[in-house]
């Protein structure tokens, strides 16, 4: 069985990708949720290298978590008004999805925002596997 976290750690170490750019198209939805729920705390679950927050336009500064990036690999404690996870779920092995969903829901007190890719990734892991290890149609995720 593939150790995906080890694969992603190696990929992050040797690659400038997974900078967090996939957040940009979603930012207006996230801002709307923050405003609607009057949220003041936010967790970016699977933040990659966290570069997406360099020019943060949101009214909150998020806590960053990504088990494959040494700088952000420590699991956060406590709860957050909102949890966002963009382009992450498809990188998690199918058998671990229920556990990750449960963990995310336990962190969130007001909202969860997920953006999940349903197509193969352009990226290939160091072991040659596609970076999207759980490819399912939208209906499967809902």
Regions found by a protein language model. Give the residues of each.
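Conserved loop-to-beta-strand segment in the C-terminal subdomain of adenylate-forming
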Residues: 122
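Conserved N-terminal segment of class I S-adenosyl-L-methionine
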Residues: 1-82, 98-102, 107, 118, ...
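Short glycine-centered segments of the SAM/dcSAM-binding site in methyltransferase folds
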Residues: 110-113
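A short beta-strand submotif of the Rossmann-like class I SAM-dependent methyltransferase core
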Residues: 82-88
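A short His-aromatic
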Residues: 91-92
């Amino acid at each position: 069985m593939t150790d995906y976290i080890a694969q992603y750690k190696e990929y992050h170490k040797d690659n400038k990708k997974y900078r967090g750019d996939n957040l940009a198209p979603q930012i207006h939805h996230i801002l709307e949720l923050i405003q609607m729920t009057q949220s003041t705390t936010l967790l970016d679950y699977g933040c990659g290298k966290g570069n997406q927050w360099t020019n943060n336009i949101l009214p909150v500064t998020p806590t960053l978590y990504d088990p494959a990036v040494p700088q952000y690999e420590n699991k956060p404690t406590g709860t957050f008004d909102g949890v966002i996870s963009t382009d992450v779920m498809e990188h998690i092995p199918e058998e671990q999805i229920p556990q990750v969903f449960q963990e995310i829901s336990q962190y969130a007190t007001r909202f969860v925002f997920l953006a999940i890719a349903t197509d193969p990734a352009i990226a290939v892991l160091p072991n040659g596997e596609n970076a999207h290890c759980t490819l399912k149609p939208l209906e499967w995720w809902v």
